[in-house]
């Protein structure tokens, strides 16, 4: 599989950052509601977070990659007594997250360039954020996530269900997406010593994504 050049991938990531700076409130209200034009079912997050939290000890450390404005996922994680670090590269999203989820810590960073201590966290979550990262950077990120996790730690993420790359207007801003197939993601995870435990298709309107849980070996 061939990927775009470094400069092109940087341009694509910048497009996503500017896009979420522009559409932050349209994408997710302070009440946690999704945009009316979106097929996303925000109520699903509660169940996903509950499944992850049920695997962790009280007070476990969780990194929420691409946390956005912190709602609902970061807030749900923190509300279950977990120590949460939210990561997002949109300044607008992050400022809202700091206000809306004071129980969590936040850092403004591009997940593709994030540095964390090895074996410093019990779980990593990435809900609808990896799909905005160029595929070459997604693949390179999985071994780093494994490095951040303690042995036996968990990675829960929404990834693509089928291969697709594109840029299109979204809620009034240009946005970029990059999806591999579910099978490709499972291969990448396995190669990074993140053993897939299960994956589920999440239908959304006429399409959908895949939710996958993996465990650090």
Predicted regions and their residues:
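Conserved class I S-adenosyl-L-methionine
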Residues: 2-57, 163
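Class I SAM-dependent methyltransferase SAM/SAH-binding core
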Residues: 61-113
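A short glycine-rich, Lys/Arg-flanked "PGG" loop and its adjoining helix->strand segment in the class I
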Residues: 139-151
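Short alpha-helix
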Residues: 177-193
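Core SAM-dependent methyltransferase catalytic element
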Residues: 201-217
């Amino acid at each position: 599989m061939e990927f775009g050049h470094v400069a092109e991938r940087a341009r694509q990531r910048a497009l996503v950052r500017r896009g979420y700076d522009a559409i932050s409130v349209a994408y997710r209200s302070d009440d946690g509601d999704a945009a009316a034009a979106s097929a996303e079912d925000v109520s699903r997050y509660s169940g996903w977070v509950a499944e992850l939290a049920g695997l962790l000890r009280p007070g476990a450390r969780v990194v929420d990659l691409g946390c956005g404005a912190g709602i609902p996922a970061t807030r749900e994680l923190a509300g279950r007594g977990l120590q949460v670090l939210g990561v997002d590269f949109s300044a607008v999203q992050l400022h809202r997250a700091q206000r809306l989820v004071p129980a969590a810590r936040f850092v403004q960073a591009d997940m593709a360039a994030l540095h964390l201590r090895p074996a410093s966290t019990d779980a990593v979550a990435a809900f609808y954020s990896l799909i905005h990262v160029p595929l070459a950077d997604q693949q390179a990120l999985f071994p780093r996530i494994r490095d951040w996790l303690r042995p036996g730690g968990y990675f829960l993420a929404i990834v693509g269900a089928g291969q697709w790359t594109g840029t299109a207007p979204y809620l009034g801003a240009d946005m970029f997406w990059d999806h591999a197939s579910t099978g490709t993601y499972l291969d990448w995870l396995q190669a990074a010593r993140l053993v897939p435990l299960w994956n589920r298709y999440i239908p959304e309107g006429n399409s959908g994504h895949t939710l996958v849980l993996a465990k650090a070996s």
